[in-house]
Amino acid sequence: MNDPIADMLTRIRNSQLRGKSTVITPASKLRAWVLDVLADEGYIRGYEKITGADGHPAIEISLKYYEGEPVIRELKRVSKPGRRVYMGVNDIPVVRQGLGVSIVSTPKGVMSDQAARSANVGGEVLCTVF
């Protein structure tokens, strides 16, 4: 697997399109940090670290729906392994005029675009969520 973040985002997107309540993805610290931001922003109900069927660590993500529709309408990977996207604090994109969120990996940790602006740090823009 070349891009674990893109894999996790695709699993979430596909599971929501199928109406699943949970999705399981392999565990990593970066994935957990991204999920922390998604949970804090209200895009997922939460997640829990489990042991997968193969004995490897995994993460079970509880997806969130509102009136039967997925809360996440759009989930896009911005920085990719072949083309990293780094932005200063003033260049971090505003998603859908502030209705969405950019998830940024900064020297102070993985955080939302608003938190990065508050902390006055830039970094690698991992993905956008709306």
From Swiss-Prot:
One of the record's GO cellular component terms: ribonucleoprotein complex
Pfam families membership: Ribosomal_S8 (PF00410)
Gene Ontology MF annotations: rRNA binding; structural constituent of ribosome
Cited InterPro entries: Ribosomal_uS8, Ribosomal_uS8_CS, Ribosomal_uS8_sf
Keywords: Ribonucleoprotein, Ribosomal protein, RNA-binding, rRNA-binding
GO biological process: translation
UniProt-listed SUPFAM superfamilies: Ribosomal protein S8
Family affiliation: Belongs to the universal ribosomal protein uS8 family.
HAMAP family per UniProt: Ribosomal_uS8_B
Task of the protein: One of the primary rRNA binding proteins, it binds directly to 16S rRNA central domain where it helps coordinate assembly of the platform of the 30S subunit.
Subunit structure, interactors included: Part of the 30S ribosomal subunit. Contacts proteins S5 and S12.
Listed name of the protein: Small ribosomal subunit protein uS8
Gene responsible for this protein: rpsH
